[in-house]
């Protein structure tokens, strides 16, 4: 997820004072950067590093705000000690091949050692230029060829390297071309390992469940799933965070936060920051957490709905917010559309919502786990 909390701080009077001196705090709102900053993800961190050591590509799956970005950034510290460089590529909002190229360029510009190694080859690539600020991308007549040349330069010159594509489902519009490109990298440059994060739909689903005709058939990444915290782990997280900040808080207040924020690390962090850093009283901190969380969630849901049947998807989500069975969801869609949807339309919407990890299904009952999404839908803040 890439509507970063730090971006939201831009609306506050003095955002830096809330972060000053807290680079290692559990309640720092930026993605964690070091293994020691992670909480409750030791097993997943070890597994991720083990996969890279064995040169296995990895897909990190999980709902929004669960800590996927923090996990890969913390892993990078361990990987660098092993002599493996990492290029972090933020794909949130990237459109098409040019969007991917620009995102890759931004990632390369933070890894100067790799940039210097590939400069000789990349500088001769169409659409690629170097300046004082590093590498930049201009419009290319053959952007996928430019991408292949750039990745090829990394494969030939950078040594052991991990390329992290965060929110890979953003590239669904170029799935066909990208699958061929990834297959070529897999076959040609075994020193280049891809780590992919996102939800199980679009390009990610195609990568993890390739058909026999897919270029990636037989090359599927290993899956690493990040679960929300249990109630016990959520309580432990908050207690440790408040201890770090020397902030007193009651058992009852922690229990209420755990109950309302439902194990999502991002929301627990936001609540802790509101109490320990902004010094808001518990009740006000809960209100601010829910208000800010629903704004972030609304932005992300609007992004997901782009290019989709908004009426159908919102009808399904709204009825699932109070839990519903398939027939009830179909009836809600029919009411909102004022026409009878066919079964395939309903099923397709539900499958996409499950793949995007917006809804859960258990024994035929559809529910929404994320408390911010439930609040957003039940309070009619999105129509």
Residue ranges and their predicted role:
Residues 140-202, 209-211:
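Conserved Walker B catalytic segment
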Residues 206-259:
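Helix-loop-helix "sensor" segment of P-loop NTPases
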Residues 54-66, 70-161, 344:
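P-loop NTPase nucleotide-binding core
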Residues 2, 11-17, 21, 25, ...:
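C-terminal leucine-rich, beta-strand-based interaction scaffolds used for sensing/assembly
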Residues 41, 69, 264, 370:
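Short, conserved phosphate/pyrophosphate- and ester-handling motifs at nucleotide-, phospho-/glycolipid
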Residues 1-58, 372-373, 383:
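A short, basic N-terminal segment
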Residues 30-32, 291-306:
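Short, Lys/Arg-enriched N-terminal segment that forms or immediately precedes the first helix
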Residues 243-299:
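Amphipathic alpha-helical "lid/sensor" segments that cap RecA-like P-loop NTPase cores
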């Amino acid at each position: 997820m890439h509507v970063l909390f730090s971006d939201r701080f831009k609306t506050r009077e003095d955002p830096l004072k809330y972060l000053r001196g807290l680079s290692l705090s559990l309640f720092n709102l930026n993605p964690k950067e070091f293994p020691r900053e992670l909480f409750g993800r030791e097993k997943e961190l070890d597994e991720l590093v083990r996969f890279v050591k064995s040169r296995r590509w990895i897909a990190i799956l999980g709902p929004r705000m669960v800590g996927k970005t923090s996990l890969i950034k913390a892993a990078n510290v361990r990987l660098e000690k092993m002599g493996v460089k990492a290029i972090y590529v933020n794909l949130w909002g990237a459109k098409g091949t040019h969007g991917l190229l620009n995102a890759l360029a931004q990632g390369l510009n933070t890894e100067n050692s790799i940039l210097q190694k590939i400069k000789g080859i990349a500088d001769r690539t169409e659409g690629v230029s170097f300046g004082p600020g590093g590498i930049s991308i201009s419009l290319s007549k053959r952007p996928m060829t430019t991408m292949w040349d750039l990745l090829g330069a990394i494969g030939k010159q950078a040594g052991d390297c991990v390329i992290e594509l965060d929110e890979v489902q953003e590239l669904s519009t170029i799935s066909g071309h990208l699958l061929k490109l990834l297959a070529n990298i897999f076959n040609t440059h075994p020193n280049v390992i891809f780590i992919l994060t996102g939800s199980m739909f679009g390009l990610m689903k195609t990568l993890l469940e390739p058909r026999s005709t897919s270029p990636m058939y037989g090359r599927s990444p290993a899956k690493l799933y990040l679960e929300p915290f249990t109630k016990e782990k959520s309580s432990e997280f908050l207690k440790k965070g408040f201890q770090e900040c020397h902030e007193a808080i009651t058992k009852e207040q922690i229990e209420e936060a755990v109950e309302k924020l439902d194990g999502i690390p991002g929301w627990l962090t936001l609540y802790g920051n509101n109490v320990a850093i902004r010094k808001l009283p518990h009740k006000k901190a809960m209100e601010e957490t829910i208000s800010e969380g629903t704004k972030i969630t609304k932005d992300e849901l609007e992004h997901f709905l782009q290019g989709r049947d908004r009426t159908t998807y919102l009808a399904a989500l709204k009825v699932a917010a109070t839990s519903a069975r398939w027939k009830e969801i179909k009836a809600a869609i029919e009411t909102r559309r004022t026409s009878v949807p066919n079964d395939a339309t309903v099923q397709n919407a539900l499958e996409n919502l499950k793949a995007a990890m917006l809804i859960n299904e258990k024994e035929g009952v559809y529910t929404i786990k994320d408390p911010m999404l439930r609040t957003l839908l039940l309070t009619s803040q999105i129509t």
